[in-house]
């Protein structure tokens, strides 16, 4: 099987993608024909290259690599790839939507408030409802990009400003101490 490992991209998580791509390459090289494919611009520019492979392993992180855009492009061109389909990818990268789906399915998730920034302005949740410590993070990023743990109100504005560098949609989430786990949910 000829496998192309697609890595790079334009998101804030680009460097994480380089590490993932290398790790995947080293893990599967023995039994397969494997080639690294750097995404360093528009995906359409490498369409012919992508069509040379039996399977594209998505080693992209963040942005269009995880939000369904690349997945939809590959499906539109009948290119097999690893990972979730475009709709599941969009939902998974939207933390707020994912949390709402989890709650509807009786899966516990830390409580949260949403802040939407429009033209540099936003409305804060009622300060009496904000508990500390909390986690402030962009709705659509991963790999802790733009994430802050806020211990008290004096740190809140700087955390919102940092998260706003990555998204106009920000979550203030209850902080739960312990080991962070990432899990897949099937079904």
What are these regions (language model features)?
Residues 1-93, 97, 116-125:
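ATP-binding N-terminal substructure of ATP-dependent carboxylate-amine bond-forming enzymes
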Residues 17, 112, 133-159, 180-182:
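Glycine-rich phosphate-binding loop of ATP-grasp-fold ATP-dependent ligases
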Residues 80-81, 109, 134:
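Hydrophobic beta-strand scaffold residues
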Residues 94-115:
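Short, glycine-/small-residue-rich phosphate/pyrophosphate-handling segment
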Residues 123-136:
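Acidic/histidine-enriched active-site and ligand-binding environments that engage anionic O-linkages
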Residues 151-187:
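Phosphate-binding site of ATP-dependent enzymes
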């Amino acid at each position: 099987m000829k496998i192309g490992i697609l890595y790079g991209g334009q998101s804030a998580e680009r460097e994480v993608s380089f590490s993932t791509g290398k790790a995947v390459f080293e893990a599967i090289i023995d039994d397969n024909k494997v080639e690294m494919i750097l995404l360093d611009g528009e995906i359409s520019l490498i369409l012919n290259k992508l069509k040379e492979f039996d399977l594209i392993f998505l080693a992209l992180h963040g942005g269009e690599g995880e939000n369904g855009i690349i997945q939809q492009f590959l499906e539109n061109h009948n290119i097999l790839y690893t990972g979730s389909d475009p709709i599941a990818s969009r939902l998974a990268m939207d933390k707020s939507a994912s949390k709402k789906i989890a709650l509807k399915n009786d899966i516990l998730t830390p409580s949260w408030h949403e802040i939407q920034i429009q033209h540099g302005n936003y409305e804060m949740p009622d300060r009496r409802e904000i508990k500390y410590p909390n986690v402030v993070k962009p709705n659509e990023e991963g790999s802790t990009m733009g994430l802050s743990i806020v211990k008290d109100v004096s740190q809140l504005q700087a955390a919102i400003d940092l998260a706003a560098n990555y998204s106009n949609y920000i979550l203030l989430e209850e902080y739960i101490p312990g080991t962070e786990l990432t899990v897949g949910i099937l079904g």
